[in-house]
Amino acid sequence: MKRALLFALAVAACQEELAQNTDPLPLNPETVGHFCQMNLLEHEGPKGQVHLEGLPGMPLFFSQVSDTVAYLRLPEQSHPILAIWVADMGAPGATWADPGADNWIDARTASYVVGAAIEGGMGAPEVVPFADPAAAKAFAARHGGNIMGLDAIPDSAVLAPSTQTAEGDGDYGRRLEALSDRAGG
């Protein structure tokens, strides 16, 4: 009986040592977005990272926080989510052009500004995270939007297609036809 108890304690101790580290990793020149596979340091606005069970030290990075939230809601996830980190846009020195490489906060406790008149790094509407609710309130006063927690962010804010403006891809059809004409189609 003593041996069985000692064995069980030893196994439990080993399992505790094997707990996966889910601390946020800083952005670096090799960090690319999960969806876009583009270098994240080349894009403005806040970023996100998701740590998955069984993939230690290899979080999925996202070029926009809205992409991070969208990933959480997609049914195709292959691994359980252990941690979700987003860039605190209220951190000292954080700007839209340079949101910071290591000012990560727990996405589950952040305050988000949703519906602000500002675009994220991929040119789509962004949900903007803050550790301090007062900083979120000040941002919303300047840029519009509503303040809410992660679970309250509506799917329409992160899963709906982005609408193009007149100055965006308004001539997409014309350019596509020109390519078809050149290709003999």
Give the predicted meaning of each segment:
Residues 58-105, 112, 118-121:
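Mid-length scaffold segments of soluble, non-membrane domains
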Residues 14-17:
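Bacterial signal peptide processing site
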Residues 1-12:
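Sec-dependent bacterial lipoprotein signal peptides
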Residues 21-29:
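Short, flexible, mixed-charge glycine/proline-rich loop motifs
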Residues 33:
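Short cysteine-rich clusters marking metal-coordination/redox-active sites
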Residues 37:
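Cys/His-coordinated zinc-binding microdomains
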Residues 42-45:
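Short, non-ligating residues that shape and space the ligands of small metal-coordination modules
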Residues 131-135, 139-185:
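C-terminal partner/receptor-binding element of secreted or periplasmic proteins
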